[in-house]
């Protein structure tokens, strides 16, 4: 744990998908052991069986109505938890006006109605997943909208990495790889900062052990058993 002035460095586990020059989603699935390959296919099929289709919008093709729809889904995620959204519609409209930012939205559709969406941002070599929401409760819709659609988009567009956001051991079984990331935090009170620094040092040792365990325990390994 390094401390410089009022800043602390905190390490944590992060899940990243890597594109090993896959030609298609089916090609990607060939890396998996048969059991987990079947599980993923079953999850995707369950969405198709419910007549859910996806429409991808990116950049300037995202009109104002689409942003309104996305925002309503984003808010629903917080309402379901009894919370208030911390971003407002003005923020999303500001994104739409920034030409240097490339948003990508995966809209889930039932018949002609949008029923959910995930918002990503496309960088030079990475797709970043950040927000999602839905106005229906449907098993596996989150995995399809937030993981599989993004993976397929990366494969089809030659994008090297997919960063779907922090947390979620369930990403491991779907092919995301764990790595160590660093965040910086400013703590002005010295006593408080020293206490946090001590905790973070101990935590980092545990994170290192956790990451090594995850690397040896993946859906590509013959010993993979995560349920």
Regions found by a protein language model. Give the residues of each.
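Acyl-donor binding region in acyl/amide transferases
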Residues: 1-10, 124-190, 197
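C-terminal catalytic domain of photolyase/cryptochrome flavoproteins
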Residues: 65, 78, 111, 157, ...
